[in-house]
């Protein structure tokens, strides 16, 4: 029993040591933006602090720089039916409408318009695209994000 208690204490200690605690300025900016949010999981990626939480049924990732300035918010929309009618109609009337929507995310920025990103693929095909839509339903340049995209394959054979 003592061995189990010691193991549990060590596990809890290791988790608390690995937990990210952002600087006060980052936490202050976050609290101004989301004053009623609880259960926040903080992480750090390439110098940015990211608050991960659920709000109104949506998973959100809010990114801040080390100076405490908001950089972007990613909201996982889960499926196409959570899109605005304008973006939904733009997608359903596009040449990608028959493709499978694998991920739907809205990305908001402090100084730019929001972008809706729909990742699509096809059954039994390795090519995937990220489709970037404006809130007005305008499709921007699609981006190939496949593991075996032609550009990646070309780069691998040249290297």
Predicted region positions:
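Positively charged n-region of N-terminal signal peptides that target proteins for export
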Residues: 1-6
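Interaction-mediating elements
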Residues: 20-159
């Amino acid at each position: 029993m003592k061995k189990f208690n010691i193991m549990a204490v060590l596990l809890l200690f290791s988790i608390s040591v690995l937990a990210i605690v952002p600087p006060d300025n980052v936490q202050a900016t976050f609290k101004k933006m989301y004053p009623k949010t609880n259960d926040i999981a903080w992480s750090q990626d390439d110098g940015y602090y990211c608050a991960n939480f659920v709000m109104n049924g949506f998973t959100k990732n809010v990114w801040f720089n080390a100076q405490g300035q908001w950089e972007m918010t990613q909201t996982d929309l889960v499926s196409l039916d959570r899109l605005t009618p304008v973006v939904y109609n733009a997608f359903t009337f596009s040449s990608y409408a028959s493709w499978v929507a694998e991920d739907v995310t809205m990305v908001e920025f402090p100084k730019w318009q929001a972008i809706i990103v729909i990742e699509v693929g096809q059954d039994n095909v390795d090519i995937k695209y990220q489709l970037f839509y404006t809130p007005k339903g305008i499709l921007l340049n699609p981006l190939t994000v496949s593991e075996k995209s032609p550009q990646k394959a070309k780069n691998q054979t040249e290297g």
